[in-house]
Amino acid sequence: MSERINIPFTNEHFVAFCEKMLGQPYWYGSVVYKCTENLRARKAKQYPAHYGSSRTARYRDDIAKKKVCADCVGLIKGYNWTNGGQGVIESIGTDRTFSSKYGAHGCPDKSANGMFSYAKSKGCAWGTMDTLPEVPGIALRFDGHVGVYIGGGYAVEERGFNYGCVKTKVSSRKWTHWYQLPFVDYGNAVFTGGGATKPDTPASEYTLGTRTLKKGSKGADVKALQEFLLQLG
């Protein structure tokens, strides 16, 4: 685990990112964005019901504190669109920015319900909550909402405007299903339910020095080491 937690797109790295987002605000329609006045104005035009005048002061406080916002499914999409949360946490409370690429890492722009349907269409395992596997990084959902299971009976979720990104006890919420996310690498985790097949998950990219290489290891870091050794002659 200590090795995988440093590798973007593994379930351990994804969970660590979600936990570091605790305390950040919920902005409807946002996908891990820096809180700015320009963003607030744009979202207010898109979703006026969620950006009424009674909420403006809170939104502007988030902006002043240079926070990072998302909605429930936006937390999941944003992790992928920012290349595994690259630069996101470091930007909180500072003037730093980070890059986000729409649809990156094979993560489509889906709603909370749409993401569940998409995962099932990709052959991901899923089931009702009475079959919840002890696999951190899987999604939890009920109609119109999604969160991330972090293990030990707890989840991280962008719960809503009045809550922001919070850690909640799974048993205290009304989750109906769990499901495997097709763009997260769950390693050797065993799933049952649904298609119960391992989807075509993008391979985790390792950079040289982030893991111990062994005979049979594959990846970009192996190629980098081979090239380095060739240069040495």
Language-model regions, residue ranges each:
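N-terminal capping segments
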Residues: 1-90, 143-145, 156-158, 188, ...
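Low-complexity, Gly/Ser/Thr/Pro-rich intrinsically disordered linker/tail segments
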Residues: 172-203
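A short amphipathic alpha-helical interaction element
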Residues: 214-233
